[in-house]
Amino acid sequence: MSYPVFASNVPTAEGKCPTFADSRSAFVPTVSVIIPVRNRSEVIVRCLQSVAAQTYERVRLIVVDNGSTDDTRSRVADWMSANAGRFVETCLLDEPRSGANAARNRGLRAVTDGYVAFFDSDDEMSPDFLTQMLAALRKDAAAQWVLARTRMIFPDGTEQVRHGVPHPSAAHHLLSAQVSTQSFVAEANLLRAVGGWDETLTCWQDYELGFRLLRAAPRTAWCSSVFHRIYRTPDSITGASLSENAEGIVHVLRKLAEQVEKVPHFPPHTLDIQLNGGHFATPSSDFSPIAAGGFPKGAESSAQAVDGSPTVADSTSIAEHATAEQAQCRLALWLRVHIIAGQFRAEGASSTADALLSAVGALLRRVSWLDLVVARLLLAYSSQGGRGAWRFAALWTRLR
């Protein structure tokens, strides 16, 4: 395999990363791997080597130093200088604002094309990750992003594969937290369209981003393999218990409740997205994919429109679907909040549980009395240390 040669890992004057100088971009999309790092001198090279070992032929490695006070930045710079032109295109950026999300967004702003994968500086990427993920995307031309499962490694050496199902709904993600930082590859334009990472969050950032991605682009490709070595260390951001991060968790759930309760609306460009194979487009989109059968089930009649534009019937169908999806997400989040409140109580943080139920419950429209009973049962089960409550909640949400 031949690798492109590039002159420097220094960003351009516009703050963008340097691009490949060869002519393959039209045929092989670039995947930018964005890694935020702060004071990870002892593990960062291991992570970089795992990205360099990718079998995919067009990788751009973007490392964003987030104010390291040790020699992390110099180690990254030395590694990039030593490997320039050998493995992947590299770019080293700085983000003075604290927080991994600020660093991730800095990296995203530097990307001009292709796909993006995010990774953490203390983990190891599987060598065939990008090859398999892009292959899955090629099989589903209407999908803008692809999901897979990941493998977690605990301090005692035990391993656990994270939950994952093909093509999860936004409601399923609210209960299962399927979308995690290292589990997806997405079009850069899609990530920008949903607003990138929320820099106000201190935990569960991928949980919140995953929900926005699934609402904006519900059609996902699926890769059935299990990837990576994701190390769960004692200083993990989630801590030893949920209640240690209660304030941050409540903040995330409040944000999600606000998003769920937003009244669905469909400006012209959104209708284009829904009907044009799920891809983000402008109001002046070419609607030839629609004429080829790329519209929602039951909307075939719109192909007869004189100008190829979506019809009123299409708009009504989409609006009805969105309303049903909103109700499903509301129920899923309602149940998830009760499960987490039960976990808070199991940890002896009853006042925190009550505060969560009050803060988030007030933002969600009331569910049916039967759903309320189920939520109370899940709360009681979780407060006694019961595990796997989300699986029953997911089943109940589907049945409703």
Q: Language model features by range: what are they?
A:
Residues S2-H251:
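Nucleotide-sugar donor-binding/catalytic module of glycosyltransferases
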Residues Y56, E261, R365-V367:
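Helix-capping and short linker residues that terminate individual alpha-solenoid repeat units
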Residues V260-T270, E320-Q328:
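Flexible helix-coil transition and linker loops at the boundaries of alpha-helical arrays
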Residues A13, F20, V31, D70-R73, ...:
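N-terminal compositionally biased, intrinsically disordered segments and leader/signal-like regions
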Residues S2-P4, N66, F280-H321, R330, ...:
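Membrane-interface aromatic/basic loop that binds lipid-linked glycans or pyrophosphate carriers
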Residues H172, S225-P234, G239-F266, I290-A292, ...:
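Catalytic core of nucleotide-sugar-dependent glycosyltransferases
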